[in-house]
């Protein structure tokens, strides 16, 4: 009887040990599954941010070339668009895209990310939410200005366009040819601002028109001629004769594409003179929108 009692105790002990082992084994499996899930989340998040970067950096040629010296390292193809677009379709698409990106980002659980990824998450979410708020006022942006306007800044960007080889030169020439299309989107945007009483004041427009007129007058001493000649001189692998040929082509494109694009922009903007209803700046318009009616 005493032996049977001991045997029973041993059985119970073994059963308890077995239960504990099963529990510990199950816990280990659950923990392993959780760890795998966290690792998967981290990997997917890295893939998401990588795709986000590639998509946004390659929306147009001039942006991608400005930020990336070797886009092929990121396996990026040549963008279809030469310049950013300011037309109604692109503005609406951007608004929809921002909302979708926020929803994608929300799917990630921050606690399953590394500290560095959590910081990236917070910065990206803050950026997207700010962009979403700004998208409520798509025509409040001041795209034209005497020095800071896009019609002035694009000259500086083109004059600093990085030239390392013949591929860069040909891409640069395509940008010169496509400047008219870019200005068309600025004209369309300006007309939409007029409809909403958000266009430049007459004084500001006068300054913009003066800046454009100065560009048009520089037919022989245009900055795009001088800067191109300097940049191409430093390129290795192109002989002197070919460089001279490219310099002639650049000067020709400025005369046949760039200056006519500025002349067209001048003409359309001049026709909008007198439509600047708000002399106090866009800030006042925002105040009127944000303040409750009393």
What are these model-derived regions, one by one?
Residues 3-290, 294:
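N-terminal maturation segment of proteins
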């Amino acid at each position: 009887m005493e032996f049977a009692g001991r045997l029973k105790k041993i059985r119970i002990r073994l059963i308890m040990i077995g239960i504990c082992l099963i529990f510990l084994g199950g816990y280990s499996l659950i923990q392993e599954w959780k760890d795998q899930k966290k690792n998967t989340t981290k990997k997917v998040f890295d893939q998401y941010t990588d795709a986000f970067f590639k998509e946004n950096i390659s929306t147009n040629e001039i942006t991608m070339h400005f930020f990336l010296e070797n886009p092929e390292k990121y396996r990026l193809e040549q963008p279809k668009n030469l310049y950013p677009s300011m037309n109604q379709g692109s503005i609406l698409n951007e608004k929809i895209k921002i909302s979708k990106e926020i929803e994608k980002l929300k799917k990630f659980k921050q606690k399953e990310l590394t500290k560095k990824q959590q910081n990236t998450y917070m910065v990206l979410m803050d950026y997207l939410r700010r962009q979403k708020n700004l998208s409520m006022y798509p025509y409040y942006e001041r795209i034209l200005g005497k020095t800071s306007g896009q019609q002035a800044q694009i000259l500086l960007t083109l004059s600093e366009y990085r030239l390392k080889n013949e591929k860069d030169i040909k891409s640069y020439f395509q940008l010169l040819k496509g400047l008219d299309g870019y200005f068309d989107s600025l004209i369309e945007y300006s007309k939409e601002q007029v409809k909403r009483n958000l266009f430049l004041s007459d004084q500001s427009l006068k300054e913009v028109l003066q800046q454009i007129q100065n560009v048009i007058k520089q037919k022989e001493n245009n900055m795009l001629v001088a800067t191109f000649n300097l940049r191409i001189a430093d390129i290795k692998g192109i002989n002197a004769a070919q460089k001279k040929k490219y310099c002639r082509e650049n000067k020709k494109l400025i005369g046949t594409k760039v200056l006519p694009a500025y002349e067209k922009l001048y003409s359309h903007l001049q026709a909008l003179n007198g439509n600047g209803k708000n002399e106090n700046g866009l800030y006042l318009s925002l105040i009127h929108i944000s303040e409750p009616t009393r």
